[in-house]
Amino acid sequence: DHVGRFGYKRSITVGWTLRLVFVLPLVAVPLLDGHINPQSQLALIIGALFCFNLIRGIASTAWFPWITGIIPERVRGRYLTRESAANNIGSFFALMLAAMYLGKDAVPHQFAGLFAFSLVTGLVSLWFIHRVPDAPAAEEDAQSKQPVKWSEIIRHQPFRKLLWVCFIWAIFMGGLLGFIVKFLKTGEGALADDRVLYASAAKFVGGLITLWFLYSRLDRLGSRPLMFLALGILGLVMAMWIGMSGGKIPVRFDWVCGVYFVMGFGFCTFYMSLTKLAMATVPELGKSHFFALYSVVGSLAVGIFPILWGILIDSLTSVKVNWLGLEWNQFSIYFTALLVVLVATAVQVLRVEEKKAARLNELVFDLLRNNPLREWMRR
């Protein structure tokens, strides 16, 4: 309720500054190895991560109304692709640096060094935040605690449909990357720690490709057709993980890198399309409240469902059933469940309302007409 009156930029700046305080325990815990018991170390880490994510979640409620206010609607797709590219480049180099620094057998003080590096880069990011202009809050947000009732927000049909997509997508994403790492490190054909990090970095390269792919398409074609494309790609990715965890496809480093690459492309395509659709769907009146609910629903699902998925995976530890040429174990069942969640997401995307969305056949025609292979064959 206070974001609009407090100011979008100010809310982000204060939130991002406070969250850095909780990086300090993450720096200290590895250095206390041998001085405090593992249970206390785990409690400190969980507490610090909880507070870090809580503050980040509160501050993030100002992010969407802020960028919606300063980025014109006609170029939001281009902005989001550039933002995604910057994020993927930074994440790629950070993960590569971590892989090279940690090596195969990391020791506790190395993790302290990584967290200290994160703290420094977080402080640097505040300088860039300071340079971004603020967006004026809507008059209703600035003067009233509750310009729109929560019941009216829920009854806003286009937003409610979008909220379902956000919620089910968060169910899919909750813990996914962590559980993939667990499979790659403990499953059959397990990879060394540094190779898992190198393979994980491939998803950021895949995400970077969206800069070329979506730069003009997101504004021209709309979000819905691109969301369907991303869901189809991610469905194939889940089929690959099912095959690997079920023993049908070998777990090889080059194959894993390829799957991560395609997965990164699918993630970024869907997320950017969903974000642009949210910015177009939320009305100007009470937009801080709409975006707050949107952020909270996604954050809660992303926070709760890793626990539920983890309980499911642990409960299936002893399951090993051969059927349809696959070994159905804890991971192959988990990836199959995610495939079902993707289908549910596609059903909800079908219900979403978008005024200027192209049809799927128009997307296919655009892909055939505007692709590098066609230009190369003309030469």
Language-model segments: residues:
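Juxtamembrane intracellular "pre-TM" segments in multi-pass secondary transporters
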Residues: 135-164, 359-379
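Substrate-agnostic recognition of the 12-TM MFS/MFS-like secondary transporter fold
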Residues: 1-11, 15-20, 44, 48-134, ...
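Juxtamembrane helix-start motifs in multi-pass secondary transporters
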Residues: 11-12, 114, 223-229, 334
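Juxtamembrane/transmembrane-helix interface segments of polytopic membrane transporters
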Residues: 30, 34, 95-103, 181, ...
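C-terminal ends and interior cores of transmembrane alpha-helices
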Residues: 15-39, 232-250
